[in-house]
Design a protein with these regions (language model features):
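Glycine- and acidic-residue-enriched helix-capping/strand-helix junction motifs
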Residues: 125-130, 179-186
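Surface-exposed acidic, glycine/proline-enriched linker/cap segments
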Residues: 57-76, 141-164
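Short hydrophobic segments within beta-strands
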Residues: 114, 171-173
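Residue-level signal for short, function-critical loop segments
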Residues: 19, 174-176
Length: 186
């Protein structure tokens, strides 16, 4: 959201729609572009950075629209002018490296302010060894690991060696009711 003008019942909202470099009206979601993309160093944000993704990707399973997006910080064509593999293999002709951000203006009667949330910084709690041991994970990371569309396809594996653990310890509410300043007092 770039700008909001107006009053309850009559808001005019200016929205920036970031360039995805893929035409939403042409992309079929076939994923051939993802299979062929040579840039595979981007961390998969949706999977809590537990695995990598290609420079062109569909943000998450069942995304609406089910259309790929290109990460301009990872795409070799956008960074160096060389590559273009996804465009070559896109049978729908959906790849557009010249796409720019769009600004949309919409009218709304009401606005819901959803501020989101920020996960607690687990690194501040050294006693759990999160920074030192790959097999110490957060509940959100566990959720992605156990999800059928997650990085392990729902198989419970240790991140360090991809073997099944024999025992686990589940520590809940790390940082809640914390008065040291690292967590939340509530």
């Amino acid at each position: 959201v770039e700008e909001v003008k107006g009053f309850v019942g009559n808001f005019k909202v200016k929205i920036r729609k970031k360039a995805r470099f893929v035409d939403e009206t042409k992309c079929t979601g076939c994923k051939v572009c993802m299979e062929k993309c040579p840039s595979r160093k981007g961390l998969n944000e949706f999977n809590m950075n537990l695995n990598n993704r290609t420079a062109i990707y569909i943000p998450f399973a069942q995304a609406i629209p089910n259309v790929a997006v290109i990460d301009p910080t990872q795409c070799l064509k956008l960074k160096t002018g060389k590559c273009g593999v996804c465009q070559k293999f896109c049978g729908a002709g959906a790849i557009n490296y010249d796409m720019k951000d769009e600004f949309l203006e919409r009218e709304y009667g009401a606005i819901v302010v959803a501020t989101g949330f920020r996960p607690i910084n687990i690194d501040a709690f050294n006693e759990y060894g999160y920074s030192d041991n790959k097999d110490v994970i957060t509940s959100l990371e566990l959720e992605r690991i156990m999800n059928a569309a997650g990085p392990t396809k729902g198989h419970f594996e240790r991140p360090s060696d991809h073997t099944q653990p024999k025992k686990i310890v589940f520590v809940q509410c790390v940082g809640s009711r914390d008065t040291s300043g690292c967590g939340k007092e509530y």
